[in-house]
From Swiss-Prot:
Source organism of the structure: Azobacteroides pseudotrichonymphae genomovar. CFP2
Alphabetic keyword roster: Cytoplasm, Magnesium, Metal-binding, Pantothenate biosynthesis, Transferase
Residues at the active site: E190 (proton acceptor)
Function of the protein: Catalyzes the reversible reaction in which hydroxymethyl group from 5,10-methylenetetrahydrofolate is transferred onto alpha-ketoisovalerate to form ketopantoate.
Main location per the UniProt record: cytoplasm
Protein name: 3-methyl-2-oxobutanoate hydroxymethyltransferase
Enzyme superclass (EC): transferase
Binding site for 3-methyl-2-oxobutanoate: D52, S53, D91, K121
Length: 272
């Protein structure tokens, strides 16, 4: 019997672990504001991620690096007011945990205390294990992120597929096993070969959520604005657009502009 039914009033980490054991795929999407999050939470979504991708889609930056911890907390506070059923996870932004495990746990505690989020997500493997240990020791549920890690874009040199070479794939597998051993409840795998995604998912007992990691992982995540077709210039191979909101919004606003210019809005029924 599938675990995921409309009877579940609040998705928990235990539900996600059980979903993997039942081979039931996990759905995950980003949200950054109250209005969109309100809709998402009525769809049966399992996980809502307040992603540092807000730096791109909300603030217009070319990378995730500029967004601050205070900004992430502000976005997450708005989303928390709307999300009641899905598990709410918040990205730890660049600079909030790298190289300083004490700072990492302080940042994670701030996120949980000030937003009411259910969990945090953190990028990296062996190099951040001390930060992960401290965060978990504070009782904060933690999701990992391996493969293409956007906060390391300057080191990686671009947004190309990761772990194609045998030694790179082995290192990713080791990092995934380490994160599970430390106590992470799930890991995002971004832009890696589908075969490797399958191998990691089969090796680990915790759920692996893919974005460009093939169909064999335990769930999928996309950026909301991307899957709704709002950003016409962003079209990676892994993205499936479920709507064309760019043109819907553009035509709607153009229609409004013309109605105002032609004195067709408001009409008598729309006036007091």
């Amino acid at each position: 019997m599938p675990l995921h039914t409309g009877d579940i009033r609040k998705i928990t980490i235990q539900h996600l672990i059980e979903m993997k054991s039942y081979c039931e795929k996990i759905s995950m999407i980003t949200a950054y504001d109250y209005s969109m999050a309100s809709i998402i939470d009525k769809t049966g979504m399992d996980i809502v991620l307040v992603g540092d991708s807000a730096s791109n889609v909300m603030a217009g930056n070319t990378t995730t690096l500029p967004i601050t911890l205070d900004q992430m907390i502000w976005y997450a506070q708005s989303v928390r007011k709307a999300v009641q059923r899905a598990l709410l996870c918040v990205d730890m932004p660049f600079g909030s945990y790298q190289g300083n495990s004490k700072k990492a746990v302080h940042s994670a505690i701030r996120i949980i205390k000030e937003t009411g989020a259910d969990a945090i997500k953190i990028e990296g493997g062996k190099e951040i294990c001390e930060s992960v240990k401290r965060i978990l020791s504070a009782g904060i549920p933690t999701m990992g992120h391996l493969g293409l890690t956007p906060q390391s874009i300057n080191k990686l040199g671009g947004y190309s597929i990761q772990a194609k070479k045998k030694d790179e794939a082995q290192r990713l597998m080791e990092d995934a096993c380490l994160l599970e051993e430390l106590g992470c409840f799930s890991i995002v795998l971004e832009k890696i070969p589908a075969k490797l995604g399958k191998q990691v998912s089969e090796k680990l007992s915790i759920p692996l959520i893919g974005i460009g990691a093939g169909p064999y992982v335990d769930g999928q995540v996309l950026v909301l604005q991307d899957m709704l077709g709002i950003n016409k210039s962003f079209a990676p191979r892994f993205l499936r657009c479920y709507a064309d909101l760019y043109n819907v919004i553009k035509k709607s606003v153009e229609h409004y502009v013309q109605d105002v210019k032609n004195a067709n809005f408001p009409n008598e029924q729309e006036s007091y």
